[in-house]
Amino acid sequence: MKNKIIWILSIFCVVLLGLWLWSQRPGLRVEAVLPSQPLVYVRLDHVEEHINQVIHSEFGKNVAAINFPDVLNRNNFSLKDTKDFQHWQRDLGRIWQNPLIRRLLNKEAAVAIYRQGDSYQVFVVVRLTLSTRIAELLSQLSHQWSGGAISRRQKYHGRVVNHISFSRPGLGLGYVRIRDLLILAPESLGHLDEIVDVYQHRSVPLSADSSYNFVRQNGYPFSDGLLFVNFNLISDFWRGEMDSRLTSLGYQTAAFPVYGLSYMPGVVSKFKLIVGLDQKYMTSGIRKTFACPALANDTLKLVPVNAILYSWGGCYDFAQAWSTAKQRLAERPELAESIETFKHRLERHFHMNMRTDVLPILGHEIGGYLTDIDMEGSYPFPRLLVFMKIQDRAKAESLLDKFTEHPVTTLYREQYNHVDIHYITLPLGAHTDPGYGFLGDYLLVASSRQLLKQSIDAYNDSFHSIVSDDAVEQFSLDKGGKFHYVTLLKTAELSRRAQDFLGWIDKYLSGRISMAAVSKQDGDNKKQELDEVIADKSAELVLAQKKLHQLKISSLSLLPLEDPETVNGAIQNLSRETDALRDDIAKYKEDKEDISRLMDNYASGAQSDKLTMYNMDNVLSPVLKGLESINAQAVTVRFGDKVLETEFLVK
């Protein structure tokens, strides 16, 4: 008996060990069962977790609180559109709350779309857990449609392909399980036989697709999500439409054949946009741009720590841009002539030549930053500074001296920490004194000389520079990496400034609405006065017409007794009087119509302003409020002969 128990326990342990080993083996890659050459392919791990994070985030809560049906109604969408949206909203919520969907999206999910002539194939792949039972899931699915379902099984090369027909919605669904993957396809949009062929090596898998592998290899090695789009497979019609718009810019869709987006979550969430490049479809100017080498960004030391938006680029070719602009202007002779005349006037006034004096001293780097938007003056005034790399500082200073010799307004000079600041003053409020100065090889132009001083302080002491900000370190923007373009946004602060700006717009629009109400009252009063004048003039016209009629009748009987000239003179005077009255009445009516049109314009403007205020309060404000939960964002761009990479970093 004892040996029997030991034997049973041994078998039980072996079974448990086998199950554990089976559960630990690597799952089958999704790319191993899908065919190659999809038009679109998207994959996401931990789908439920990521969606819940978005839903329960402050941004998600604020967006969810927006009353979208009311927004659509206020913005004059049709009743059908509003009802369709509400129906879609309810269906989406019901689907997401469905336990079946939650279980299917618990791990990994993918969707692939294939183009076949004028039709498309769609496959959905989900990774199943060890405890998932297909029969149970599909019975729940059948119950969910509450219309009954008819199932049938098909054998294909040793694999069972299941087909389910749902009677109520008139839909069909096919599915096949291969190891831990469940592949589903609408009956009308997918042939699961192809999945079996790929798995059994009779067809080329997605994992062997060179375009897909290009995107995957340039993405994050252990990404949670990946999007792949093959533009070469888009219909000729859409490619023709896009090419017709891009050709004037020197592009063709064939120049950017594949797109991808790789996603990796973390304390700093990372998104990398990958664009494949095919330079044989680019103009020489565009190829020259993509041949620009990446640079180590040395301009962060110019930026004060209180900057809320910063951007820099290291591949600007001003000579090429000047040449391109002249070519474009040649297509519009009238505009080209006026701009050329204005340019010549500037060159004569300042005794310089744009092509020979200005362009040669400009470098390839340009950028700037924003610290605030001042709302205290009559209009919002951005606290903005722009910097530019200079090839020859001595020539640049000599050129700017020509501007100071022939100023268009009074130019002041101040020295701050051994740096000369030149500035002018504007009657727009405090600190509206734009100016310029040099720091190293950079020319700085600012909307306020206070910003120039802040840049000088940052340049001399990194403690005052944005380099000391945690976001710069976490985004690795100061590690000596080479980029083509960099942008940093302190999203929370920028969102608060944007809300302040919306508040200013709200006050401005409220003032316009009040003015429209006053104008309407004035217009109503003027129209009433004109109605009274028109009534009086009309009464005078009736009397004058009666007198004229009587005079004409009586003149026939009295003509032998009266002087004909006297009678005719009276008739002419009275005729002129009636004509003048008619002209006056017509003019008053035109004035009334002008006032009505003006009032209609005021009313239309007020209605538009009210709608703008509503959209700001009920759409933009919640979105901006939600963005306060995002501390900072950064965008970096790198490119080479074959690939353009844009990385989005979110903290």
Q: How should these model regions be labeled?
A:
Residues 10-36, 40, 167-169, 174-179, ...:
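Leucine-rich, highly hydrophobic segment in Treponema pallidum outer-membrane-associated proteins
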Residues 389-417, 459-465:
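Active/binding-pocket-proximal capping segment
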Residues 2-8, 13-163, 211-253, 270-380, ...:
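Structural boundary/hinge residues at secondary-structure and domain interfaces
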Residues 361-362, 369-372, 415-431:
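Flexible, glycine/threonine-enriched loop-and-boundary segments that flank and lead into catalytic domains
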Residues 141-147, 191-210, 460-465:
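A short alpha->loop->secondary-structure connector
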Residues 42, 183-184, 311, 386, ...:
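Buried hydrophobic packing residues in well-ordered domains
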Residues 162-198, 424-460:
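A short, solvent-exposed beta-edge/loop patch
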Residues 115-117, 155, 175-178, 415, ...:
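Generic beta-strand structural signal
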